[in-house]
Structures are given as C-alpha cells and as structure tokens.
C-alpha cells in the first residue's frame, strides 16, 4: 500500500485531481482542509504547518497500515513540511503562479523532487495518466 501526495498552491486544483484519482486506485482520501477542521487548528504559521504535516502523516500512515492506498491533498509549502509527510509518490500541481493567500505565496518553495508535474487544470484527463504512471511506483 502506498501514499500519494498531491501538493501545490491553494486554488491550483489539488482537491479536484485527488477526487478524480482516489477512486482509480481505490484509495482513502485525506484532505488537509477537512483534517484541519476536525482538529480545529487554523494556525497557518510555519509551526502550524509543520504540525499539520505531522497530523496528515499520522493519518496517512494509519490508513496505510490498515492496508489502504492513500491519496492526500494539501499545500505542503516548504521542504521541511514535505519531509514530515511520508509520500511514496508526489504529484505537484503547478497550474497557478500565486494562490489566494499572500502568506502562503511567500512561504511556498517549489519542490525539488516530484514524480508527476501537473501544469494544466484538466483533472479528468490527467488522473488516468497519473494512475498509469503511479503503477510503476506503487
């Protein structure tokens, strides 16, 4: 069982792509906004984002240990936040140059490592391609 991370700026299309991809791999879904809401933790400072990455990692690992594939979508704006999340396959959704929130735009560092680079908001056509390529890694 593997964990697929779909990351990028807010509004880039991460959730839409995750919603298309998850059923293809019969995966459990983790959405960062839903996890934050359940934890009632709206701290978007660097420390808050690390805490969120650890929280997402804990949920993802638990689901993986239960025998599930996991598709998680969240911003994961810094290398440190990404290092805290145990992704087996990374999809970078790079469809916009600036997101909705200035603090996130300032904090966001483009990833050095990723397995699939999405540059257009075309989830219905891209999800099958990502699925096929992820089979090599999954």
What does each model-identified segment do?
Residues 136-138:
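Conserved small/polar residues in nucleotide/adenosyl-binding loops
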Residues 6:
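Hydrophobic anchor at the beta1->P-loop junction of P-loop NTPases
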Residues 47-98:
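Glycine-rich phosphate-binding loop used to anchor ATP phosphates in small-molecule kinases
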Residues 14:
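Conserved lysine of the Walker
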Residues 39-40, 98-108, 127-129:
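Short, charged, surface-exposed secondary-structure boundary motifs
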Residues 72, 115-124:
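Phosphate-binding beta-loop-alpha motif at adenosine-nucleotide cofactor sites
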Residues 18-58:
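Conserved substrate/cofactor phosphate-moiety recognition/catalytic segment
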Residues 10:
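The conserved Walker
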């Amino acid at each position: 069982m593997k964990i697929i991370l779909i990351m990028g700026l807010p509004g880039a299309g991460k959730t839409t792509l995750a919603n298309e991809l998850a059923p293809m791999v019969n995966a459990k879904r983790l959405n960062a906004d839903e996890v934050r809401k359940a934890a009632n933790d709206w701290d978007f400072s660097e420390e808050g984002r690390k805490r969120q990455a650890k929280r997402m990692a804990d949920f993802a690992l638990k689901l993986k240990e239960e025998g599930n594939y996991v598709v998680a979508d969240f911003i994961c704006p810094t290398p440190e936040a990404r290092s805290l999340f145990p992704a087996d396959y990374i999809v970078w959704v790079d469809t916009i140059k600036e997101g909705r929130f200035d603090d996130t735009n300032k904090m966001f560092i483009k990833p050095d490592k990723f397995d699939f680079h999405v540059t257009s908001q075309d989830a219905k056509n891209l999800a099958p391609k990502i699925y096929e390529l992820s089979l090599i890694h999954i």
